Amino acid sequence: MSLKERFTSYAYLIRLDKPIGTLLLLWPTLWALWLASSGTPSLQMLMIFIAGTFLMRSAGCAINDYADRDFDRHVQRTKHRPVTSGKISGKEAVVVAGVLALIAFLLIQPLNIFTKELSVLALLVAFIYPFTKRFLAIPQAVLGIAFGFGIPMAYAAVLDFIPLEAWVLFVGNIFWAIAYDTAYAMVDRDDDLRLGLRTSAITFGSYEVLAIAFSYGVLFVSQLWVAHLASLSNYFLIGWGAALGCAIYQLKLVSSRKREDCFLAFRHNNWLGGFLFLGIVLGLSIQ
């Protein structure tokens, strides 16, 4: 394998070609940073968390491909991934994940000890998540915890404690992950059933669209609660309303249960997260 081919394989391993995962991890982190800092996060803090988000998502992808290497080759959508196709060994994937996680940990050294302690828990959850598809009925809940760990970490970094609004934001994010990753799991449901894997799309069965709607409901109610706790102005509702429109559109898509519609609904969550961030920015900056 040439150097160019090896670089390309590593790029695919950490999903450089698919930034949606990084964005779904980044939006909740930005929500928390803006709320914790009352709308004025320091540039250093912002850069640390943005870079850390990219590194940890990349590490998570590498460990996910290692964990799923014996399953991915049997799924049409994933059979060409670098590890399962043999372009990268399982050992290499683990090393890549470890190196990226180490860089992320070194990156947060300027932050307080509380944030560093939380980062260890975040790493453990991120590395455990891929294996939960073997035994948990709704592994998407663990994904929500992993993708939401930037929330308590951001509050800890800025305030050195975690207030109630952070936990409300965190719980809402878990349900958001259940919503968008259930749509994602609907794409591979037939393959996952054949392989004996467990996902929320399988667990919810014919009620999966209702479960997605309920999860979105929890997200949007939690956002309103956070807005109240953080004393955001009514301008927050501009972003909140736009995000709600996104959710309604996504529910319409997944209701068809077509693979391409479910995948589009999943990807469309980037806009939902961005609109909620816009609402927080407006609610903090315009009183």
UniProtKB/Swiss-Prot annotation:
Pathway annotation from the record: Cofactor biosynthesis; ubiquinone biosynthesis
Necessary cofactors: Mg(2+)
Catalytic reactions on record: all-trans-octaprenyl diphosphate + 4-hydroxybenzoate = 4-hydroxy-3-(all-trans-octaprenyl)benzoate + diphosphate
GO biological process: ubiquinone biosynthetic process
PROSITE patterns from the UniProt entry: UBIA (PS00943)
Gene: ubiA
UniProt similarity note: Belongs to the UbiA prenyltransferase family.
Recorded topology in the membrane: Multi-pass membrane protein
Principal cellular location given in the protein's record: membrane
An MF annotation (GO) of this entry: 4-hydroxybenzoate polyprenyltransferase activity
Source organism (scientific name): Polynucleobacter asymbioticus (strain DSM 18221 / CIP 109841 / QLW-P1DMWA-1)
Described function: Catalyzes the prenylation of para-hydroxybenzoate (PHB) with an all-trans polyprenyl group. Mediates the second step in the final reaction sequence of ubiquinone-8 (UQ-8) biosynthesis, which is the condensation of the polyisoprenoid side chain with PHB, generating the first membrane-bound Q intermediate 3-octaprenyl-4-hydroxybenzoate.
Assigned keywords, A-Z: Cell inner membrane, Cell membrane, Magnesium, Membrane, Transferase, Transmembrane, Transmembrane helix, Ubiquinone biosynthesis
Protein name: 4-hydroxybenzoate octaprenyltransferase
Signal sequence interval, chain numbering: none
